[in-house]
Amino acid sequence: MKLKWRGLQFEHYILGILLAVEWIMSFTFLGYIHIPPISITTAHIPIVVIACLFGPVESSVAGLFFGLGSMYKASALYVMLGDRIFSPFQTDFPIGSILLSVGTRVLFGFLMGCIFKIVNKSRYKWAGKSLAALIATPLHALLVYGAMGILFPESGFNYKSSFRWGVNDYAIAAICILAVILSDIIYHSSFVTHYKNVINDSELRQHWSVKMKMSLFIIIIFVFCIAAFSTIYFASRTEYMFGVYGVKVTKKIAQDILHLQVQFLAAMISLNFILIVIILMIYNYMKHREYMGEMDALTNVMGRRLFLNYCTKCQNDRDDIDNK
C-alpha cells in the first residue's frame, strides 16, 4: 500500500499506535518468552501487521524499533548467554551484534513489506495475506539464526536452527496469522473507513500557531525530563533499599537496576503515547459531529458561526504559506 503521507492524519495515528505497541513489546513480557538458551520473541508481530496495512518503508521503521529495543534489552548483565550476542557491549564483535539485532529486523520488515505489497496486488488477497503471515515467523527466525551462524558461529546457532520448531513456535505463528487477519478486517471495515475519512477531512483540522507548537514542545520536553530524573531517582532508591536489607549492591547490579527502570520508562511512555493518540482521535471525531451539527439540514450550507470559523482557518493557512 503506497501512501502519500501528507494530510493522512488517520494513517499517522494508526502507525504511531502500532510503533508504540512494538516498543512496548520490545521492553516487556509481551514480546519475549525467556526459555534457555535463547529467548523466543513475539515482537515481530506488529512489524508484520504494519507491513500488511502500510508498506515496506513503514515496516522497515518498525523493524528498526524492534532492533534497537532488542539491542538495548540484551545489554543487561542478567540476560541469558544466548541473548548477549545481540548487544554490541557484550561481545568482541560489536558491529556484528548491531547487524544481528538491528540489521536483520530492518531487513525482515522490508521483506515483509515487499511481500504484502505483491499480495495486495494479487487476485487472491486473503489467501495471499494468510500465507504471508504464515511465513513471517519462520522468515524472521531464518534471518536471525542465519546471521548468528555467519557472524557468531561459536554461538552454536545457524540457519538450521530456524527449522527446529516447538509448541511455542507454532503458537506464535498462529497468533501472527490471527493478528494480521483481524487487523486487516478491522482496518478496512466500513466503520473504520468512514472514521478515516472523517479524521482526514481537511475542513476539520485545527490550526496550530507557532506559539502553540512551541509551548507543546516545551511541555513534552519538560515531562520527559521529569520522567527521566524520576527513573534515576527510583533506581537509586532501589539500591538504597537493598542496602537497608543487608544486600550488597555492586556496580553491575546497580547498572542492571537502572537498565530495568529505563525499560519500564520506555514502556510507560509508549502506553501514554497510545492514550494521547486515542484521545486525539476521539476529539477529532467529536469535532466532526460538531461540524455536521452546524450544517443546515435542508440546504447543507454552513451556518454563520461555522462559516466565520472556516474563514479564520483559511486566513491562518494563507498566513502560514506566506511565512514559508
Sequence positions of predicted segments:
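Alpha-helical transmembrane segments and their cytosolic interface
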Residues: 1-17, 145-245, 256-276, 283-291
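Hydrophobic transmembrane alpha-helices
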Residues: 1-62
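Short helix-perturbing small/polar motifs within transmembrane alpha-helices
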Residues: 2-25, 72, 76-148, 180-188, ...
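Alpha-helical transmembrane segments and their helix-entry boundary regions
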Residues: 58-63, 129, 133
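Membrane-interface helix termini and inter-helical loops of multi-pass transporters
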Residues: 32-35, 82-88, 153-161
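Conserved nucleotide-binding and Mg2+-coordinating catalytic segments in signaling enzymes
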Residues: 290-312
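Residue-level recognition of pore/gate-forming positions within transmembrane alpha-helices
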Residues: 66-67, 137
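Active-site-proximal structural segments of metal-dependent nucleotidyl cyclase/transferase enzymes
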Residues: 310-324
